[in-house]
Each structure stands twice: as C-alpha cells, then as structure tokens.
Swiss-Prot record:
Belongs to the phosphoribulokinase family. Keywords: ATP-binding, Kinase, Nucleotide-binding, Transferase. It catalyses: D-ribulose 5-phosphate + ATP = D-ribulose 1,5-bisphosphate + ADP + H(+). Its EC number is 2.7.1.19. GO terms for biological process: carbohydrate metabolic process. It comes from the Bacteria. GO terms for cellular component: cytoplasm. It comes from Escherichia coli (strain K12). ATP binds at G12, S13, S14, G15, A16, G17, T18, T19, T20. Gene3D superfamilies: P-loop containing nucleotide triphosphate hydrolases (3.40.50.300). One of its GO terms (molecular function) is phosphoribulokinase activity. This is Probable phosphoribulokinase.
Amino acid sequence: MSAKHPVIAVTGSSGAGTTTTSLAFRKIFAQLNLHAAEVEGDSFHRYTRPEMDMAIRKARDAGRHISYFGPEANDFGLLEQTFIEYGQSGKGKSRKYLHTYDEAVPWNQVPGTFTPWQPLPEPTDVLFYEGLHGGVVTPQHNVAQHVDLLVGVVPIVNLEWIQKLIRDTSERGHSREAVMDSVVRSMEDYINYITPQFSRTHLNFQRVPTVDTSNPFAAKGIPSLDESFVVIHFRNLEGIDFPWLLAMLQGSFISHINTLVVPGGKMGLAMELIMLPLVQRLMEGKKIE
C-alpha cells in the first residue's frame, strides 16, 4: 500500500474500453482536485516498430513466437521499478510510444518510435497507469503487488479481435493478413501474461456485444456501446451499495452476488459512480482489498 503516493492501474488492450476508463478517472481526479501523473504501458516496450519487426522475423526463423503481450517485448522490470519509485517518493519518469503520424509529427519523429524519457511532473497526488501489464506477475517480477487500485477492462475475446483488426488496419496501416498473423502469434503470451491479470484486479469491466460477432475476422465495424452490455465484477463487496447503483444506472441488474450488469452506454457513468469512493478511500490512506 502506497499510502502517500497511491498507484492506480487500468489493465487491458487499447480499444478494449481503456479510453472510457481513463476519461472516467480524469473526471474523478478533477472532482477530487487531484493531480495525477500519467504513464502509458506502451512506453515500456523494448523495441521500436522496425526493431520489433526484426525480432519477430528472428523468432519465427528460430521456431519461436514473440508478441507485445509477453516479457520479451516489454520491460516488466522497469515497469515494476516505476511503480516502486513512485510509491516511495512520488517521482519517476515517462515517455510515449508514437503509434501514428498524427502522434509522431509534433515530435518530428516517425511512427513506431519513442519520445525521450522525461521526469514525471511534480508534485502529484497519484500515479495513473493505462496499458497491458498493470497487474502482470512473472517468476522474476510482480508488478501487481505495487498497485493500490487495479482495474481490468476486457471485452469478450471475439470483440477484442474485431477491435484490433479494425484499429490496426484503419489507424495504423497494417494489412488484415498481418493483423491476423499477429493474433495467432500472440495467443500463447495472451494466455500466459494477459488473462491471469484479470483474476488479480479489484474490479473488472467486461463488454459483451448483443450482436453477432461469431466471425470476428469478417466484421465490418465495431459493435457500439449501445449494442453491448458491460459486466462488472467486484472482488470485494465491502462498501458497494448495489441498491443505489441499480437506482442510478437505468437498465442495470445483478446477475451474480458480486456482478452488476449495465447497458453499454452507461459504462462511463458506472465507472465514475463505482470508482470515485474507492479513489477517495485511497487518498484517505485506506487499503482497498
């Protein structure tokens, strides 16, 4: 527990709803008058895009797989050290991975490269991480133990593949074949390093579409929030006022003793209502179980 300098992490693939989650947290920080230092998970990649392409080819020639989900392409040690340092001193460093030309041009760089490391702003009240590995645990590193509030954002897997396919082809210039190859290549790392994190979270938000996603690789568009439900799982029920949440979130219902289901369009509001009191508890120096 980092009582003086709490660490909040949202873990999940980009496009999974992490943007909605980040917006909800920023609203909460503003409402509580908190200054947050933000760290992006992509900044802990080991390789630039050309370097990663070369690493993939070398791994394939050697009969191995490498992906952005696993430790070979990410510096889990540096991520863990970042959380430790911030928890102890409120200090650290960050950089950005530039995915697109729009992101790269202001830095006079090309897509697929990193900005220089820079110190985190000071003073701040909380560290906010958004990325793939906020709750990762390996034999060498335990990132999850340094997180005070861990939130998982994960769609059902077919929806995740649809989001990846459409995002990577329309925004990042990849071919459909390259994206499908990436899905196959990433599966072992996804199973070993991504999915176990969602058993360590305090909360999970899982988007479930109500339209047919049986063949994600033939999808022409991403199901909208209004075409989805969001399944919210609570690890600990202490302080969770289900009757109040049901009254505030029209169309919501309880599907299990520790699970609330809300219409997709209510996802952002649900996050704000649920997480604001949790952030308040953190800032009061209380531990979230």
